[in-house]
Amino acid sequence: MSRTVIQVFEETAARCGDLPALKTKINGVWQATSWADYRRNVRTTARALMGAGLAPGDGFALLACNSEYWVTAYLASIAAGGVPAGLYVTSSPEQCAFVIDHCDASMVLVDSEEQLAKVLAVRDQLPKLKTIILVDGESDAPDVLTWGALQTYAEQVTEDALQSRIDALKPDDLATLIYTSGTTGNSQGCDDVAHQSDLYRRDRTRNRGHPAWP
């Protein structure tokens, strides 16, 4: 039976529980996050995104390096009904503007003040963008929320409301957008990936000996 990315994530978290899902190097020491905590963080962040205004079908751009924040926000945006799209951290402000506008992003996650500066430089070209989430750093620019400030919005949304968003997802719904790099300009292409297509890719990867999921 076809499932969604979030259904498979929930099943994996329930099955793996206290086993490590993610590892992050902090002050030279690898710290593990269990599947149970990973699930809890994703659901809390999904509620926070809903509270901050992410609506079903909204684009959610990520301009950040690979990290626990990235994968948490990525899955949280899907759970909240959004459609995530990753940007290359080497993108110019103009390339960022192209992708953020093209994917109809109402929110964008940036992991540093350097990446934030790129978005702010083209902010007037992005009328659909409502919120910029800053993982590391501080800013008093309008519409910028730190990661900690974002999490407080979770209090405005119940678990039942989040579950309703998750239950509304269908296997053939759009799950994510993947943009190619533009060698000298904007992205040369965009791949629309449905939930069932994303899971098919996961299964193909796992069958080749590379377990993307337990």
Each model region followed by its residue ranges:
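Conserved AMP-binding/adenylate-forming core of the ANL superfamily
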Residues: L22-L75, S92-A97, T146-A154, A194
